[in-house]
Amino acid sequence: MKRSLLTLMLWAWSLCAAADSTLRVENAWVREAPPKAHMMAAYMTLKNTGSGDAVLTQVESPAFGHVMLHKSQVVDGVARMIHQDEIVIPAQGAVELKPGSFHLMMPAPEKRLVEGDRVDFILTFSDGATTRVQADVRKKP
C-alpha cells in the first residue's frame, strides 16, 4: 500500500513539474508608485513552450491584499482598464503584460515598495499548475 501511494505521489508530482516546465516568465517587474499610493501594477512576459494553450486564471502575492488581471484598452475614445477573468497564452506563443495592455493590478500594498525591492507572485493556471515569480520593483521599465 505504501509503495502504491508513493508511486501515485511521484506520478502526480511529475505531471505538475511537466506542466510547469512549459511556461517561462521573463522580465517580471513592478512599477514603483508614489508614497501613499493605494494601487500598483506589475508586468512580465509569459512564454508557453507547450503544445496546448496555457490559461492564467489567478495571481496571488503576500505583498498585496489581492491581485487582479486587467487589460487597458481604448473604448469609444476613452482609455479604460477592463477586468479579465483569464489571460490565454497560446501554445508555442507569448503574451506580454505591459503598460497599455494586459497587466496585473494590485491594490492595498502591505508596505511601501521602492526601487530595488522584490515582490513574490504565485501564478495559477486553469489546469491547476502554479508558477512562482519574483519581480523587481523599478521606477521605469
PLM feature spans:
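Positively charged n-region of N-terminal signal peptides that target proteins for export
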Residues: 1-4
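Sec-dependent N-terminal signal peptides
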Residues: 6-9
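N-terminal signal peptide c-region/cleavage motif recognized by signal peptidases
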Residues: 12-18
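Compact, glycine-rich, soluble single-domain proteins
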Residues: 20-141
